[in-house]
A protein has these predicted regions:
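Short beta-strand/loop element within the Bergerat-fold HATPase_c
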Residues: 89-101
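Short conserved segment of the HATPase_c
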Residues: 114-126
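Short beta-to-alpha transition helix within the HATPase_c
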Residues: 4-8, 21-44
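Conserved short strand/loop->alpha-helix "switch" segment adjacent to the catalytic nucleotide/phosphoryl-transfer site
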Residues: 47-69
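Short alpha-helical Gxxx[C/S/T] motif in the catalytic ATP-binding
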Residues: 142, 146
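Acidic ATP/Mg2+-coordinating residue in the GHKL
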Residues: 109
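Glycine-rich ATP-binding loops of the HATPase_c
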Residues: 153-171
Length: 207
């Protein structure tokens, strides 16, 4: 087990292979950023995955905005999904989709979900999704910052699913799912526009 975990962390085993689906992220900033986040996740015994619908190309016009929002959502997911050493690896799934000049981000995790009665409370400064809602020392700022930055460019970040309920046939509780909408942050290339058009003309054909 120790050797398997070492392979996973160093990227030499099946769990440490290149982030599957990364070829669908053709924007250079996001490509490098997600690759680095996958490595960070492995160090925390968390597997980062890309959702099947992930597809983005072009050039970010607001790379700091996008990577800050995405980074905080991914970090939050890693924190929620990471468990004790020797336990099952956690999972974080990220989906990044281009819609014209808008970037849509969805981040879900295998953690315990949001415990607050009002899931929106998780965006208050000093609050975290980890056990012990209010965190001293200035932590618990990531989600609040992500929402503030998204709203600054006319977008938003919200909780799509608070998770934590699970099902009768599933012993593992479902984690939280966050969505971010960031308008005006992507300059589509001519190739991206052509691909979008061809996909519309040929349903069922994916890049």
């Amino acid at each position: 087990e120790a050797l398997a975990y070492l392979d996973e962390v160093t990227g030499t085993g099946p769990g440490g292979a290149l982030l599957a689906g990364l070829d669908n992220v053709r924007e250079p900033h996001l490509h490098a950023f997600l690759d680095a986040k996958a490595a960070q996740a492995r160090e925390r015994r968390v597997v980062l995955r890309l959702g099947d619908q992930t597809w983005i190309q072009g050039v970010l016009t607001e790379p700091v905005v996008v990577t800050t929002v995405l980074g905080n959502l991914v970090d939050n997911g890693i924190d929620a999904a990471s468990g004790p050493d020797g336990g099952q690896p956690g999972e974080v799934e990220v989906e990044v989709i281009a819609d014209g000049d808008t970037v849509l981000v969805t981040v879900g995790d295998s953690g315990p979900g949001i415990a607050f009665e009002d899931a929106d409370d998780v965006f208050a400064e000093g609050v975290t999704t980890k056990p012990g809602a209010h965190v001293p020392g200035g932590r618990g700022m990531g989600l609040a910052l992500a929402r503030q930055i998204a709203r600054r460019v006319g977008g938003d970040v919200w909780v799509a699913d608070a998770g934590g309920r699970g099902s009768a046939d599933d012993d593992e509780p479902g984690g939280a799912v966050f969505v971010a909408r960031l308008p005006g942050v992507l300059a589509p290339t001519d190739e991206a526009e052509d691909d979008s058009y061809s996909q519309t003309d040929e349903p069922g054909v994916t890049p």
